[in-house]
Design a protein with these regions (language model features):
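Short, hydrophobic/π-rich interface segment
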Residues: 141-201
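C-terminal edge-of-domain segments
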Residues: 196, 202-212
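Short, cationic low-complexity segments
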Residues: 184, 222-233
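Amphipathic interaction/junction segments at domain boundaries or subunit interfaces
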Residues: 70-168
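Short, charged/polar, Gly/Pro-enriched secondary-structure boundary elements
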Residues: 162-164, 212-219
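N-terminal functional module detector in eukaryotic proteins
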Residues: 206-208, 219, 225
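A short, structure-level motif marking secondary-structure boundaries and short turns
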Residues: 65-67, 166-169, 224-225
């Protein structure tokens, strides 16, 4: 099925990104014989179409920066792929899809070092700007704590459309594969993420971010919980 044939309300929704489609097709190619691949992909498309018809319509469409590559709608497409192919796809492969969408932008920023005050302040400003965008759309409800020189950056989401979608349609079990990329992205900036909870299994998704040389990191060792989430003590 051509993407243009999908019956979605494009006045409020967007199509999955081309990079997301490429990643999903690569996993389908990995697990299915050639004669089945087109039919499997069409099942993913139809699931995407079906679930968007039951989904909220206030996420801003193309105007909202959260709806780009690796964003809310790509997460929805990845969940639809998981729904169709959960019997063959692995947890690590699901992580790889989101990593391949998100991490290229961070690879370009490897010169950033959050251990240095200049970059730490610049990161804080970026998060503060992101909060203003969130306040415009009220999709991800974001709160950034005041900046303090001697402490890590802290912000949290108390609402996350991807988590909301996962819980509503029964995909909460695969959300760790989509959330764990937050750790990998920070590591490329010489930073460490410390997290204790998410919007899927709690009331917020917390982000405490510091340089990878900060003593704070040793005080909050990382582990994987029974669901696959990367977390900190």
């Amino acid at each position: 099925m051509k993407d243009s044939e999908l019956q979605i309300d494009r006045s409020c929704h967007v199509l999955y990104s081309k990079p997301c489609k490429k990643e999903i097709l690569a996993k389908i190619t990995l697990h299915y014989p050639e004669v089945e691949r087109e039919a499997v992909w069409e099942q993913v498309q139809l699931r995407y179409e079906e679930l968007l018809s039951k989904w909220r319509t206030d996420l801003g469409g193309k105007k909202n920066f959260h709806n780009g590559v690796g964003g809310t709608y790509d997460c929805i497409a990845i969940m639809c792929f998981y729904d169709v192919c959960r019997d063959v796809v692995t947890f690590r492969e699901m992580e790889e899809i989101e990593e391949n969408l998100i991490l290229p932008s961070f690879w370009k920023l490897r010169f950033v070092d959050i251990n240095k005050p200049f970059w730490k302040k610049l990161m804080y400003r970026a998060f503060s700007t992101a909060q203003k965008h969130c306040d415009t759309w009220h999709d991800y409800e974001m709160d950034v704590a005041p900046y303090e020189n001697s402490k890590p950056i802290y912000y949290e989401f108390t609402a996350c459309p991807a988590a909301e979608f996962a819980k509503r349609f029964g995909f909460a079990d695969i959300m760790p594969a989509l959330c764990n990329v937050d750790y990998a992205s920070m590591e490329l900036l010489h930073a460490k993420l410390v997290r204790t909870t998410t919007c899927v299994d709690g009331c917020r998704c917390d982000y405490t971010i510091c340089g990878d040389k900060d003593p704070y990191v040793k005080e909050h060792s990382e582990y994987r919980d029974e669901n696959g989430y990367r977390r900190n003590k």
